[in-house]
């Protein structure tokens, strides 16, 4: 069996887990922080999830299956990218997990992990991509979050 690598990154968002959860499970909000991506799913474990859009002038349709949902805590799905140049077969899917941790100060730590990465170069790309996504998520959520 091949050794695989896991990419991980996190960010602190000045909002409640509920506000962050709504942002990661609402298609219209996802589109704001995930490069204009249109997401389709019913947000239930075992259901398919698709990501469609255009990146650098190239259309894509990525997909996966929702594996675990714990509201305001965990969102996990498999993920295959049409742009990765890999065949659409189970061993080429990553598992992407969003973990939300509630801080006593009212902020939320969002940690994203992506597994089944085959090289350090692929890991660097994943970490860079997720950092960009998390920064944009933070901006979108904090802009919408009511301030006390």
PLM regions with names:
Residues 1-38:
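Hydrophobic ligand-binding cavity/cleft-lining segments
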Residues 39-42, 59-105, 115:
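Hydrophobic-ligand binding "helix-grip"
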Residues 20-21, 30, 49-51, 66, ...:
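Hydrophobic pocket/interface hotspot
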Residues 109, 115-148:
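A conserved amphipathic terminal alpha-helix motif
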Residues 4-10, 48, 61, 74, ...:
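Intrinsic-disorder/low-complexity, polar/charged segments enriched in Ser/Thr/Lys/Arg/Asp/Glu/Gln
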Residues 37-51:
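A solvent-exposed, acidic/Ser-Thr-rich amphipathic alpha-helical stretch
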Residues 12-14, 101, 113-117:
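Solvent-exposed residues in well-ordered beta-strands and their adjoining turns
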């Amino acid at each position: 069996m091949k050794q695989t690598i896991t990419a991980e990154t996190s960010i602190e968002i000045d909002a409640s887990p509920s506000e962050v959860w709504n942002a990661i499970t609402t298609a219209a909000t996802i589109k704001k922080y995930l490069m204009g991506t249109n997401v389709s799913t019913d947000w239930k474990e075992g259901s398919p999830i698709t990501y469609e859009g255009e990146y650098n002038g190239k259309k894509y349709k990525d997909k996966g299956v929702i594996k675990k949902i714990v509201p305001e805590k965990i969102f996990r799905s498999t993920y295959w990218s049409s742009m990765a140049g890999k065949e659409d077969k189970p061993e080429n899917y990553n598992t992407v997990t969003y973990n939300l941790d509630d801080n006593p100060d009212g902020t939320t730590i969002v940690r994203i992990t992506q597994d089944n990465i085959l090289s350090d170069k692929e890991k660097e790309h994943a970490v860079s991509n997720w950092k960009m996504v998390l920064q944009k998520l933070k901006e979108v959520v904090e802009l919408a979050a009511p301030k006390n």
